[in-house]
Structure formats: C-alpha cells, structure tokens
From Swiss-Prot:
HAMAP family the record matches: YajQ
Domain of life per record: Bacteria
Cross-referenced PANTHER family: UPF0234 PROTEIN YAJQ
Organism of origin: Streptomyces coelicolor (strain ATCC BAA-471 / A3(2) / M145)
Keywords: Cytoplasm, Nucleotide-binding
Coiled coil residues, start to end: none
Protein name: Nucleotide-binding protein SCO4614
Amino acid sequence: MADSSFDIVSKVERQEVDNALNQAAKEISQRYDFKGVGASISWSGEKILMEANSEDRVTAVLDVFQSKLIKRGISLKALDAGEPQLSGKEYKIFASIEEGISQENAKKVAKLIRDEGPKGVKAQVQGEELRVSSKSRDDLQTVISLLKGQDFDFALQFVNYR
C-alpha cells in the first residue's frame, strides 16, 4: 500500500479578507457610535489601515474588523495588528495578514509530530509548508487531531489529504 500524506499550510484567502474588510467598512459607516469620529478602514498596499480620531474608537474599528474575519472563517492568528499610533489628529492601526509557516515554526511542528505523534509518521519541511506522510491514514488522522489540540501562535490548515 502506498504512503498517504497531507500538507500543513498557513494560508488565507485574500478575497475573504477583502469581503470582511468591506463588511467592516460598511458597518463603520452606518453605526451611530462611529458618526463624526472619522473612523475608516481600508487597504494601504499590502497592509490594512484603520483610522479614527480617538484611541478607543480605532480599537473599536479593529474589533469590528476582527468580528467580520471570524464570521468569514478566517483565524485571528493570521491577523498581525499593531498598536494604535497617534498621527496628527488621528489614531491609526496598521495590520497585516500573515501567511506561510516560518522555518522555526515548521521545525517546532515537525518536532511535535516526531515526539508525540504515532510511530512511522514522517514530517518534512517544504518551503513555507510541511508535508506529513505515513503508511496508515489513521496515523495521519491522529496527527491532525494532535495538531488541532495544540495552541500555536499561527493559523494551520490541512490540505492535499491523500
């Protein structure tokens, strides 16, 4: 019987992030508590820019955006939001969407699979993803449930299960 395998990746669909951003912008423009405070959210190149005239309003904009991301099924671990910064008369928060698994994080996951996973399961780092293979599909299911039970500081998705 051939080896079964799956890939562990950390990817976010840009279209879903864009949809969440548009929904947040619409809610911000319509909510009464955001009237007259200059609150906005938009793309600024590859970063997301949130603006308002007070620190608590700009953090409220971030909360609205985070709630829209959750509703669209995007993990908040993929969102890297900075601290509110005063810029002129406005507060700004720059946020970015993190994609890919770094080498050190991939090594942590591979070590966890080797140490706590079933015997005969191999994990190989391939760029920004991790390939896990085994002769038994049951072992792969065990590895998936093991990883879902862990609390990593980055989002994980399991793809190409074969």
